[in-house]
Amino acid sequence: MTNRWSFDVKKNLVTLILTWLCLSISTAQAARIKDVSEVAGVRSNQLIGYGLVSGLPGTGESTPFTDQSFNAMLQNFGIQLPPGTKPKTKNVAAVMVTTTLPAFAKQGQVVDITVSSVGSAKSLRGGTLLQTFLKGLDGKTYAIAQGNLIVSGFSATGADGSKIVGNNPTVGRISGGAMVEREVPSPFGRGDFITFNLLDSDFTTAQRMADAVNNFLGPNMASAVDATSVRVRAPRDISQRVAFLSAVENVNFDPADGSAKIIVNSRTGTIVVGKHVRLRAAAVTHGGMTVAIKENQQVSQPGPFGNGKTVVTQDSDIEVTEKQGKMFKFEPGLTLDDLVRAVNEVGAAPSDLMAILQALKQAGAIEGQLIII
């Protein structure tokens, strides 16, 4: 298909670079396309494999599946154990090996891997991962892993059974421990369009991105498909396409502000409030009741020459304290900062604020989403 990118590459690139520099200077505070989106089809892939770690100083395991894996490995080297023989493999551990294959990873490149025990091994420190095939979702082998583990954790056991464990000794890493043997096909060089997918879906942001690209390249070169995707017409020639994408992904534009949200982590008490959250007219009162129970043990001691027995009795002291909650009244249009400030002035805990937020949302007094994680 013929488009405005079919003319001379050098002239094309010079024009793009000059335009990009002008836009970068004029919109220095805006976001680049590459910072808020990713190219469709350009993605990483997860790989996984099952293997053995050997050379452990007695911290390995002797589980049935480890023994089976060890015997299978010996058979691959032509070693056949006598029937009924059970090897003592305290220096061997069964492990799972995982890694992420980056986009455009080429044959012969290396990637980091993570090795984790799947059995009862006490520690992987000092071990060596034996050759392990790493496969993708399609069952094909894309990388082969092997190497010496680096384990940050430690484990020590005393003769009396006491044990000290620091960090996690059953998980280790090997830097550059896997070599890529098969490349993953990429759709990057196919078709007449490049699609950018926003990291945070938003209709306004998608339209603004398309408008910015059209201002940069010319009319009708980009269009917003939906709240996530923006499709840009691109040259078919792969060398031109790389230069084209390099210029387009550095175009600056102003993303839309996110929708009004309140994120509450009920486990840690963390509360994050978006700047567009508003309150409607509401009155809030929140009081707390504290129940304290103290258990005191009383000992009844009989006389020295009596036939009585020493008896321990329980004496419970229960105290109930209720705080008188203050009432807060908010006018419509106030931000959540006003609520947080008012609650903090009376020394309320984060749990109190979470309860107030939930009640306000149920009453329809919060203009925004309340998300509890």
Swiss-Prot record:
As one GO molecular function, the record gives: structural molecule activity
Q: Where in the cell is it found?
A: Periplasm; Bacterial flagellum basal body
Keyword 4Fe-4S carried by entry: no
Query: Which InterPro entries does this entry report, sorted A to Z?
Result: Flag_FlgI
Give the range the annotation lists for the signal sequence: 1-30
UniProt GO BP: bacterial-type flagellum-dependent cell motility
Q: Which domain of life is it from?
A: Bacteria
Stated role = Assembles around the rod to form the L-ring and probably protects the motor/basal body from shearing forces during rotation.
Name of the protein this chain belongs to: Flagellar P-ring protein
| Protein encoded by which gene | flgI
